[in-house]
């Protein structure tokens, strides 16, 4: 895995491919729309873009997004999908066309958002999940959030995930308003509600957790759950910072995702995480290079329930590695995804 070889006069180094554990491919169309306001203002733009999507548009537009992921060093994508079942099947076709492995994280939506997001019942949602599995498609269950799924939905989806040994992914603690609404409805914070409804297990990945408090992090640690950090998107949307140092001291696994695809570069996601940890702690090397590379690959694979995935090759002659003694540290410290071939 780490032995350089020379092909066509170019020395390369093979690494496990990076795993994109959280992606909304359709949101790539919003890149460059900076605008003003906050997350909730951006969400209105996102909803309008979602409304435009059809199976045909997914088959037409997603392959380019997935090829961009591949070019950046991702070889697996977890597509957190809430556009509808036909569009999910189209996303699988798009991934096959691009040549990237896909795990469909089919989102459950009971309330909020757009009508097209919603299933009429948990039974309908689970039937859709069954249909995807029946077609041989890798899947995970994904109650969108505690905003979108009430407690009884969370309980039933959690039981299904356990019964079928499936990954469970869910957005939580991304925005203060989400936490305030959850406290008003249940008297619990989002991750506390996930724990109460059986959603926290070793197969669970909580996406963002930028505003998780210490008690919530303790719950994740006890359950063996992971956090998916998406720092380029979180920066773009003003979501805040993952409390990286407090997460690490509890031994909680971290994986990464391109999320809204405002920027597609796993090395940048990892470098952002490293920078956040340094700023929060006032120290350097809070996260080792080995740890960061594990976040980029192995932890993502664990989050998606996969054991084997494709490698990616580093161009050792790339200008960004000139004069670098340790290739792995150089990748994290100073390279972009342009270094991959």
Task: Describe the role of every protein-language-model region.
Residues 311-341:
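C-terminal cap of metal-dependent C-N hydrolases
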Residues 29-61, 109-123, 176-201, 223-226, ...:
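Active-site gating loops and adjacent loop-to-helix segments of metal-dependent hydrolytic enzymes
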Residues 168-175, 237-240, 245-269, 306-314:
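Short acidic/histidine-rich active-site segments
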């Amino acid at each position: 895995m780490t032995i350089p070889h020379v092909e066509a006069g170019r020395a390369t180094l093979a690494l496990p491919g990076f795993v994109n554990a959280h992606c909304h491919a359709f949101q790539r169309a919003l890149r460059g729309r900076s605008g003003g306001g906050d997350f909730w203002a951006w969400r209105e733009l996102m909803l309008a873009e979602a409304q435009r999507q059809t199976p045909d548009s997914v088959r037409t537009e997603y392959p380019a997004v997935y090829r961009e992921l591949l070019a950046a060093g991702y070889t697996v994508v977890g597509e957190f999908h809430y556009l509808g079942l036909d569009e999910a099947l189209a996303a699988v076709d798009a991934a096959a066309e691009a040549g990237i492995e896909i795990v469909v994280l089919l989102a459950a939506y009971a309330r909020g958002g757009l009508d097209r997001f919603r299933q009429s019942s948990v039974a309908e949602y689970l039937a859709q999940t069954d249909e995807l599995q029946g077609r041989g498609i890798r899947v995970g269950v994904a109650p969108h959030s505690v905003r979108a799924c009430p407690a009884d939905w969370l309980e039933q989806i959690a039981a299904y995930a356990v019964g079928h040994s499936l990954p469970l992914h869910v957005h939580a603690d991304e925005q203060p308003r989400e936490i305030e609404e959850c406290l008003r409805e249940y008297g619990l914070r989002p991750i506390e509600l996930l724990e109460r409804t059986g959603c926290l297990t070793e197969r669970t990945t909580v996406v963002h957790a930028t505003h998780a408090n210490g008690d919530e992090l303790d719950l994740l640690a006890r359950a063996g759950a992971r956090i998916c950090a998406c720092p380029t998107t979180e920066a773009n949307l003003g979501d805040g910072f993952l409390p990286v140092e407090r997460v690490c001291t509890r031994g909680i696994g971290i994986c990464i995702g391109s999320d809204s695809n405002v920027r597609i570069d796993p090395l940048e996601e990892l470098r952002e995480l490293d920078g956040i940890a340094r700023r929060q702690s006032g120290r350097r090397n809070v996260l080792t290079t080995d740890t960061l590379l594990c976040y980029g690959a192995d932890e993502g694979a664990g989050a998606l329930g996969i054991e084997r995935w494709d490698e990616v090759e580093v161009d050792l002659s790339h200008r960004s590695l000139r004069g670098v003694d340790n290739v792995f540290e150089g990748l994290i410290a100073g390279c972009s995804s342009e270094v991959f071939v």
